[in-house]
Amino acid sequence: KKVAIKNNIKVLQPVKIKEEYEDVTSLNPDIIITCAYGQIVPLAILNCPKYGCINVHASLLPKLRGGAPIHKAIINGYDKTGITIMYMDKGMDTGDMIAKEEVKIEDNDTAESLHDKLSAISVPLLMKTLPSIINGTNKREKQNDADATYAYNVSREEEHVSFDKSSKDVYNQIRGLNSWPGAYAVLDDKNIKLWSSSITNNKYDKTPGTIINLDKNGLCVATKDGSVLIKELQIPGKKKMNCLLYTSDA
């Protein structure tokens, strides 16, 4: 948007694209490209561009169709994901695929770091793919709907950490929601944001959610199969802090 404004390129920001599509179709675009666009594009727009509507989707389709593929890739424990360049159709990320590029999800990746990895490969992949789209030499690959999984937008319920599951699942949930919207747990009737954690090798005969220990290393909490160490958290109304500061503040 900033680049467009700086170069006197018209900017449209329809609140509801289905109701304001004529502003787009009146431009008679040759091609439309979207990335992380949160609305279903109406057929009037899909059928408008000469070379079609292209979407840059942050997963290896048909896996993780939907609005939160980066978050859900980590939360669900995927070890890889990627970028798919695809044609848009009336469905949710169901169109024919044009190109893909894969990235590895490291054990310490967060939603933020994975976003940055995918951003870094998306533009070069798009630029490499565009000429074949324009000259009609690209190969279209149908998606296998039987292999599809979905990554719907993160709900408020999904932000809440239940320790009544494996340490790995808790760890993945916390890093999968970092840096937005953030996972949280309830402590003393307060929603405490959990930003960073690690899996410990210790197992305790304690009810999941029980605080085992709190020291400068972190907040150790029992899980279904062991424990996790919360390293960085945030009290309502305050900035993020490590547990050393939290112990001083508590």
Describe the role of every protein-language-model region.
Residues 1-181, 190, 226-229, 235-237:
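One-carbon transfer enzymes
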Residues 163-248:
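An anion-binding loop in the catalytic cleft
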